[in-house]
Amino acid sequence: MAEPSQSQIPDAVLESPVTGVGLVPGTLADQLGEGLSLLVFLRHFGCIFCRETVGDLRAAVAADPSYPRVLFFYQGSPTEGRAFLRRDWPEARAVADPEQEFYERFGVRRASFLEGLGPAVLRSRARARAKGHENGRRSGDVWRMPGIFAVEAERVVWAHQPRHAADHPDFASLPVTISAAR
């Protein structure tokens, strides 16, 4: 379910130092810059839906030059992030969060059994497989849910709270959805 949040991101979060892939040295605030940014919290790298999300977002960004800047968050080290993104989106920017501190600060929760492995998730595997995605080696917290936040001027202006591990918005139409919510 997507709904606007309009919440201010605390200074302590914005001023937190970050490392990862394709980042400028500094803090989370340094990565956001001006304008709209899409913060995408991925599930573990072995998850078929993590791979689907990265692939779908890459296609949406390629199709729309005005697409919001995407900043991924992932549960691994910078080395793991480089290896994953080298294959799936070499130009992507991503924050390494092996301790899942940003996940917690943004309220990206852990899944229940049904949210992680329920019927809706199992049905969604066919969708991801039809796009050429498969599960890989598990890494990180396999129960951590995904999360997506549109951020502008240090405020969350829209958020997608997934109903289950495979739930994500239509990335191609996401800029229109965010614009309507603002």
Predicted regions and their residues:
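Short active-site neighborhood of thiol/selenol oxidoreductases, capturing the structured segment around
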Residues: 28-58, 69, 73
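N-terminal targeting signals for export/organelle localization
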Residues: 1-20, 181-182
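A short, polar/charged loop-to-alpha-helix boundary motif
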Residues: 166-181
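A generic fold-level signal
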Residues: 33-34, 65, 143
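Thiol/selenol-based redox catalytic cores and closely related redox-interacting motifs
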Residues: 97-166
